[in-house]
Curated annotation (Swiss-Prot):
It is found in: Cell membrane; Early endosome membrane; Recycling endosome membrane. The gene is CMTM6. Master regulator of recycling and plasma membrane expression of PD-L1/CD274, an immune inhibitory ligand critical for immune tolerance to self and antitumor immunity. Associates with both constitutive and IFNG-induced PD-L1/CD274 at recycling endosomes, where it protects PD-L1/CD274 from being targeted for lysosomal degradation, likely by preventing its ubiquitination. May stabilize PD-L1/CD274 expression on antigen presenting cells and potentiates inhibitory signaling by PDCD1/CD279, its receptor on T-cells, ultimately triggering T-cell anergy. The modification N-acetylmethionine is found at M1. GO terms for biological process: endocytic recycling; protein transport; regulation of protein stability. Keywords: Acetylation, Cell membrane, Endosome, Membrane, Phosphoprotein, Transmembrane, Transmembrane helix, Transport. The keyword Transport applies. Interacts with PD-L1/CD274 (via transmembrane domain); the interaction is direct. Interacts with CMTM4. Interacts with CD58, ARG1, ENO1 and TMPO. This is CKLF-like MARVEL transmembrane domain-containing protein 6. The modification Phosphothreonine is found at T171. It is a multi-pass membrane protein. Residues 33-160 form the MARVEL domain.
Amino acid sequence: MENGAVYSPTTEEDPGPARGPRSGLAAYCFLGRLPLLRRVLKGLQLSLSLLAFICEEVVSQCTLCGGLYFFEFVSCSAFLLSLLILIVYCTPFYERVDTTKVKSSDFYITLGTGCVFLLASIIFVSTHDRTSAEIAAIVFGFIASFMFLLDFVTMLYEKRQESQLRKSENTTRAEALTEPLNA
């Protein structure tokens, strides 16, 4: 018997380059774990906090530097934290860690970063020297802090939806258990 006749009906064709598996860094990055709105918000948080940090770094002199230094620390920290959370969501590391812990960490990190970034932007507004780089940094800082807070509100809404869904499942189960068996 010829091998072609035995294996022909069960083997698949070579998928070729169009359908082939992803290679390189693309094989390790998967954006589907976050809904589209959350992906957009995470991308905006990352880019806006980086832009705020870059604009702040362009400032060459200041009279009241405390607000500038605090804003520098917060904008850099916000960029690094949002990059870290995005890396965790998009890489295989997400499957190695408990997903509830990742979501809980993201929830509290996003809330804390948004509040502190908003505070840093308010402080920087009161101490800046009105240069164009400072104004740009302040604008990016406020927008970034609002993106963090909007992401927090989105996560809060998702949590409430999940808890209401679980509550309705529990009540239907309880009703089914209290019905008489011979009815």
